[in-house]
Amino acid sequence: MMKKNKYSRELFIKYRKYVYTNIIILFIITFWSIIGPIVLRSVLNSSNNAFNTKNIAMYFGIVVLLYVTKYIYNHFKFYFTEKFKNNETVDLYEKVFRMKYSKINELEPTYITERVSLTIETVFSLYVSSLTGILVSCIIMIATLGMVFYINKLLFILYFVQIPLQYFGFQKLLNGENSKLAHYGTELQKLRATSNKNIKLILSDVNGVKQYGKNSIILDLIRDNLKKANALERTANTYAMSVCTVLEFISICLKNSSYLFIIYMYINGGVSVGDLVYLNLVNDIYYNCIGDVINIQINLRNLKGSLDFVSKEIEDNFEENGDKILSEICTISGSAENIGYGKENVLIKQGEFSFARGDVIGIKGESGCGKTTFVKLLNKFEESNRIYINGSDIMKYDNTSLREKVIYLPQNTYLLPCSVKDNILMGREVDESRWEKLLKYDFMTNILDKGLDKIVLENASNLSGGDRQKIILARLFMQNPDVVILDESFNAIDEETGESLFEILKAIYTDKIIIIISHSPKYLNHCNKIIEIKDKELIQFR
């Protein structure tokens, strides 16, 4: 049996009310399922008035109640499904957002998205749905065994021995926790997520698809990704089907043996007509329940892969978070020592820096020298114990409060698939006075003409480069940060538009810290401080 997992325990605690309700409704369904055949047996075994209206009405009344309860259960299940998937998908992404920056890049965001979807589907269907169903199956089996014991002791023994016989035979086939099914289940989830991720990345660049869509390399990439995933899926399914076929053969042999034995008992007067009808009704139900209980172990192998993804790839890679709330930033200082990606890839060996309110800092250096890596230390995307904000170690600050005050803008703007207004506000309450002031800026004219309700399409394909930057600038204004980091943010637009936006930004944030990474002297000439990274050394001028 699978070891307990922190994530699975959290889910049970959170949804125990729904799980218990689910179990209660299933108990009622189970009760009607059990009592119906018993009532029919009693009717058939009755020596007098066996088929009177009252007895027949009772039986059909039970059947009606059974299906009414099933109808109610289906509505409850659909409601529970919607609630669970909505809540847990959001909560799981919240966990993803707490992961280390480097780990998200290492796993790749699209891969993580695919694994999250697979995890939610697997956890819901197997942990929440199947396990409650197993409890009901066990109750049906116990009730059936009790009734069979009452009817015929020898038949009871035949029914009872099926459980250990099938269970231990199944365990032998699975070969314990480290079975092929466990390995296939985990590896298939990873490979399927990787395949879907790669295909989505290929299709995400519409320009590339249109330009090179008939190029064999693109189609070969899609084909290779599909082949790898589908080949493993075929291997896994073939093995699983082999196991299931053996189990099904054993189950059918045992079930048919039970039928033959029941008929034999009836012919020899060991059971009555009512007993014969009852046993025929419950025989399939009983063996299906045994199958449900045993087959859940196959499903638990898939569940294990999903739970391991949450615990080992997400939760074990949470970034460090301080508990000190940052209300404002007046100064940033520190030293850059051995900054990079491990001992073998050091980008900056040494250097000191110091910024204060009102500073506009330009950062220059050759491509790949560590400019972006350096600025990502300032918002804790990358970790360092040598950065100080207002004289305190940056690692002591709460990540959320820090990132509300330090805004990092990469070259590729981060726009969401929602309205322009929502992209500006980013879920914040509207500060009416600040909003009215924003709308009066000249750079907002073109955005207002096109409409704040305009929906941003994938990759912001319906917006010009200049409009994208203006939306980001408007978002900045509404966020009111203390530090703005521009990482070649204006490279996608012409210099005239970029310089105009930079002038606006400087005018708005005269008492803030502005940091710009750029190769263009036009932007660097606006700076009162310059940092150059050269020969793995960070040097601050002025």
Regions found by a protein language model. Name each.
Residues 11-17, 101-102, 118-127, 131, ...:
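An intracellular "coupling" helix at the cytosolic face of ABC transporter transmembrane type-1 domains
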Residues 413-455:
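Conserved "ABC signature" C-loop
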Residues 214, 238, 285-315:
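Cytosolic ends of transmembrane helices, especially the final helix of ABC transmembrane type-1 domains
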Residues 97-141:
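Juxtamembrane loop-to-helix connectors within ABC transporter transmembrane domains
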Residues 18-31, 52, 59, 63-66, ...:
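Transmembrane helices of ABC transporter permease
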Residues 1-33, 49-55, 73, 77, ...:
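Membrane-integrated ABC transporters
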